[in-house]
């Protein structure tokens, strides 16, 4: 007998995130703030400290960038530091479609004085969280022999090898960063 299966996993529901206000506090933009109480995202190009439409230290150094704003994290990453204001869907963009492939084979036979069964299987899974997944291989051999009317013997052996790639949990988990990232911050672009 040979069996195979393929399945796909996706995040079923996502929370609704506000996509109107940029990171910051009390209406002021702060590129290092994790709160989303800054100015309207649509007004970032007019921000007095970071806006590409205004006179500030960045536009004095690099020239005006109409319709954009300066993002220090992008500059530190070696990317173009000027970004067009928009709301990002960081949580949706973070997750992958998970794929799981299962396959197995089984050979079994019953004889006059015994029986045997050999099963082989494998599972390869790529998780919905990037860099997570599992590879699993298993084998099972069962044999039984009737040596005489009153005496039988048997053997049963199992082998399983698993390699699991998982995300860290608790305080080091990535999910707090993904769900907590402000909508104005491009988590995937830095």
Predicted features and spans:
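Surface-exposed loop/interface segments of Gram-negative outer-membrane beta-barrel transport/assembly proteins
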Residues: 3-86, 97, 127-132, 138-190
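Residue-level detector of the transmembrane beta-barrel scaffold of outer-membrane proteins
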Residues: 115-119, 152-154
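N-terminal periplasmic accessory domains that precede
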Residues: 1-4, 105
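Transmembrane beta-strand segments that form the barrel wall of outer-membrane beta-barrel proteins
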Residues: 120-126
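Residue-level signature of outer-membrane beta-barrel architecture
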Residues: 109-111, 122, 145, 157
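Short coil turns and loop connectors of transmembrane beta-barrels in diderm outer membranes
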Residues: 112-113, 149
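Outer-membrane beta-barrel initiation region
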Residues: 93-98, 105-111
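Outer-membrane beta-barrel architecture
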Residues: 106-108, 119, 142
């Amino acid at each position: 007998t040979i069996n195979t299966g393929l399945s796909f996993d996706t995040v079923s529901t996502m929370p609704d995130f506000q996509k109107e206000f940029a990171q910051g506090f009390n209406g002021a933009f702060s590129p290092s703030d994790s709160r989303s109480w800054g100015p309207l995202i649509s007004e970032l190009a007019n921000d007095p400290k970071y806006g590409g439409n205004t006179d500030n230290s960045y536009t004095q150094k690099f020239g005006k960038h109409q319709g954009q704003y300066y993002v220090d994290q992008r500059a530190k990453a070696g990317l173009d530091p000027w970004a067009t204001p928009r709301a990002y869907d960081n949580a949706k963009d973070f997750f992958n479609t998970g794929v799981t492939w299962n396959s197995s084979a089984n050979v079994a036979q019953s004889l006059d004085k015994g029986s045997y069964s050999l099963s082989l299987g494998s599972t390869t899974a790529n998780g919905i969280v990037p860099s997570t997944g599992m590879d699993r291989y298993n084998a099972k051999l069962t044999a039984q022999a009737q040596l005489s009317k009153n005496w039988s013997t048997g053997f049963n052996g199992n082998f399983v090898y698993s390699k699991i790639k998982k995300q860290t949990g608790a305080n080091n988990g990535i999910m707090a960063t993904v769900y907590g990232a402000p909508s104005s911050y491009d988590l995937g672009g830095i």
